Amino acid sequence: MGKYNASMEHFGLALAGSVAARTVAAGLLLALAAGCADQQPSEQADTATAAAAPPPVPASSPDDTVTPVDNIDQATAAAGDLSLRQDAPLHYTVKKGDTLWGISNHFLRDAWQWPQLWYDNGQIKNPHLIYPGEVLTLVMVNGHPRVLLSEDRLHPRVHEMPLDQAIPAIPIDAIREFLRGPRVVDKDEIQHAPYVVEFTDEHVIAGQNSGVYVKDLPKNSAASWSVVKIGQPYIDPDSHETLGFEAIPTGEADLREYDKEVAEMMLTRSPQEVEIGNRLLPLEPESFKADFYPHPPAKPVEGRILSVYNGLSQITQYNIVAISRGSRDGLDPGTVLGIYQTARKVSDPYDDGKVALPEQKAGVLMVFKVTPRISYGLVMTETRPAHVLDKVRAPRSSSR
C-alpha cells in the first residue's frame, strides 16, 4: 500500500505487504445482508439497472501514507466535514448481530458518511463486505481519519466469503415480514394480469388448499403465481402524478390444469382471504442481497412519505415507509434521506393571519427497495414524530 509508518506494526495491520495481502485486507465494509433482490416485474422490475450507482468509496493509492491514531483528538481535529465521534473506538471487533448502520454509528454522528470514512483499495470483488470476527481500525490516511480492516482479525479472510455471511446494512428482522408483503404495479401491468373468476367449490372467498379458476393465464407460464388484491393508488402529492398501485398479497397458487380459456389452480398459501377478481402476478424472489451500504443521494432529490407499512398513523424507528421518489430520481438501495416535518402555519394571537413555523427534522431513513417511481425505506432514527406527507431529502450533516 505504499509508505507506511513503522509504528503501524503494533496494530497488526501489515498493510505494506503485497497486492494480494492488500486484497485480502480490503474486502470489507458495509455489506448488507439486505439489498433488494425481490424486484418488480415489467417497468417496476428494473430496479438494479435503473438505480443510480452509489457514490464510490475512495480507493487506496500506492502512494498513500497510513499512520496510527494515538488518540481520538488527533483524528477529530483532522476530520473536517466528517462527523467523527469524539468517543469513536480506535479498534472495533465486528460481532454477529451487528449491522453496518450500527457500526458506522460507533464512528460517526452521521452514519451515512460511511463511504468517506471507509478505506478501500478497490482491488477485489464486493469490497464493502464486513464479516463477524473482523477487526476495524481507525487510522490516518494522508492526514485524514479513515477506517480499514486490520490483519488482527479473529478469523483471517483467506478465501472469498459468501454474501449471506456478511453483516447486513440494516436489521433484517425489521423488514422480514415486508419482504413478502405489498409491491408496486402500474396500470398496464394490472390490466394484463390474469385474474380469479370463480372458486371450484363455488364459495365467495377462498383460502389455503382451495381451488380457483383463473382467466387469461399465459400458455407455458410459470407453475406458481402470487395472488394479489389491488389496493390504493400512489399519487405524488406535489405533481399529482399516479406513481403506481399497491398490490397486496392474498395468496400463492400452483397450476393444476391449464386451459386457454380458464385454468384451474390450487391455493398453496393464503395469508388473507382470496376473492374473485384478485389478480395474479409472477412470484418475486425471496432472497435479499447484501450488497449496499449507507450513502447520501447521488443528486438533489426531494419527495414525500406516501404511506406507512401496516397502516400506522405515526412513524417511529424501524417503521417501513413508501416515498414518492424512485430509481428514475437517482435513488438506490442504501440511499439515506432525512425526514422533515411538513411546515405548519398557526394563528397569530395579536394579528390577523397565520405564522409559518420553521421546518423540523424528524429522523433519517435508509432506502432498501426501489422501483422506478417509488421507493421503500426503513426509518433508522427518529427525533420527532413523523407522518404521511412529511418531506424527505438529503440529510443535513451534524458537523455543520
Predicted segment positions?
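N-terminal secretory signal peptides that target proteins for export/translocation
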Residues: M1-V19
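Surface-exposed, polar/charged interaction patches used for macromolecular assembly or partner binding
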Residues: G2, A37-R400
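A detector of low-complexity, intrinsically disordered, Ser/Thr/Gly/Pro/Ala-rich segments
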Residues: A6, A21, A45-T47
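Sec-dependent signal peptide hydrophobic core
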Residues: A20, V24-L28
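C-terminal motif of bacterial Sec signal peptides marking the signal peptidase cleavage site
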Residues: L32-G35
